[in-house]
């Protein structure tokens, strides 16, 4: 969800930038849009580690990394899930400034647009972890200096599995990574299997509101669409053939008349923000009070915590199967 949000809404007001930083997770990487493969390439030596990152670039390490700079909160969550935080020597400024839960005790090594080159080179990290989207010139300079960079670029839940596996390879935590993936797959399949047999007429139409003016939503090839579909809903924007994070007219919204509206808390502090929007007054979701506000992080960050987002979407879309909606941080 991530690089697409950056390209679509970076010029929109500060809150959308916050969504981008969460959905794009403060990356330090290239603006290239090569498709994600995440393949773990067979090693050519006993200690050599070869990976293909989210931009399709090969990354080679002589041994598991012991000093890592992390400029993507999603990657930091994965590292925490692998019990490998002792390998992290620094993170991004945004996470420090916004007191992210995992940021305590760490120094910032750069912001979203500009990296602290002097500080980074002095730290001599074994590798930098980030996401596609920003600081291209700085990243090239670091590459020229021989600093390894692994770019995370996962847009679907299935791609999160490979990111976890690759983080395990980088950290020498292969077993822990496989166990984390197995547990995550089990939880995801536990939800998706319960709605897999539903006919189309039993799947509620869902609209995810990314931004209100202009009205923006999530289409194909986004985490949000993946969550909606795996939770047994129909994303009306994806159904219209739109990809990424497009603008969506109020006329089209009224025409498609979604049964459910979901929005991030960074856009709507509570459901009244949406329910009281006069443009939505005739929409089924508003009339029937099927409007839900979800926290940003577990619905947009490509880590094992995405299961919390999927659970909330499932409860919002099919409470008769998954129980009453409950916010999960």
Locate predicted features.
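Bacterial Sec-exported substrate-binding components of ABC uptake systems
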Residues: 2-76, 175-207, 257, 316-329
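Short helix-initiation/N-cap motifs at beta->coil->alpha
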Residues: 54-56, 106-118, 240-250
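A short, structured surface patch at a secondary-structure boundary
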Residues: 67-123, 127-132, 233-236
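Flexible loop/hinge segments that line or gate small-molecule binding clefts
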Residues: 95-102, 134-166, 170
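Structured C-terminal subdomain patch of bacterial secreted/periplasmic proteins
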Residues: 161-162, 166-169, 178, 182, ...
